[in-house]
């Protein structure tokens, strides 16, 4: 908050004594005759001067509250061209609340044209709340773009995963193979893991097995696969299918978290016969944390031989 000339309080370019009366007039007009208020609100929103910032903020709220047909072009114009960030962001938010085909088209247009990362992020969220075919297509197109921020693409990927539809799951799996950035790939792994389906868990296990994939991504895929309801045998078999020590360490950890008989059996096998002494030691450590009556016998056997 700042104090303007003559001690007048100012909020982000708004002067209270200048705007209070005008805002009150807008409110009164809206309550008295919404049809007449519409054109007035649109004229207010067409202004770009600093003196009308607070008035425009109020006008965009009132216009959205009207729910009148044809508000989308005005909201879109404000989202694209208003010099005040708050007005632009409010315009995007209210476009998401209109819920018409025209509003989805407007949000899509913002995604395709704006260079403002904050506005892009809000448009991604707004589209994610629509649930229409067109909004989903817009999010998919945005997730594939390489000329926008990774953070925005990550959010589009996240929201696509939240829908849980088979079409979006198939899209995300296909997208994974086309992505180059590790962070974006990690977001796909995370989004698919959130569905909790065995089908996606097996797909994640497949990524973990892929020796052409980056080690960190393989470990991430294994971590998320473990959160799903896959049988322990899937993870036990993964140990033998990789020669990478870091991956084997991750498999040992995953097995230790399973805590069932099959996991203990595999850890016993590793502790007894793995040629890598460090991996045997890790298996022994985790066996010591498990509540399995056979552990003491195995440890004694190792000590005696």
What is each stretch, according to the model?
Residues 76, 84-90, 94-98, 108, ...:
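A generic tandem-repeat structural signature
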Residues 19-20, 50-54, 69, 84-86, ...:
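Alpha-helix N-cap/helix-start positions at coil->helix boundaries
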Residues 1-29, 33-43, 54-55, 74, ...:
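Short linear regulatory motifs and low-complexity interaction segments
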Residues 249-290:
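Ankyrin-repeat and related helical/solenoid repeat scaffolds used for protein-protein interactions
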Residues 29, 33, 63, 67, ...:
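Alpha-solenoid repeat junctions
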Residues 1-12, 34-47, 68-80, 100-113, ...:
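Amphipathic alpha-helical scaffolding segments comprising HEAT/armadillo-like alpha-solenoid repeats
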Residues 236-240, 245, 250-252:
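Alpha-helical adaptor scaffolds
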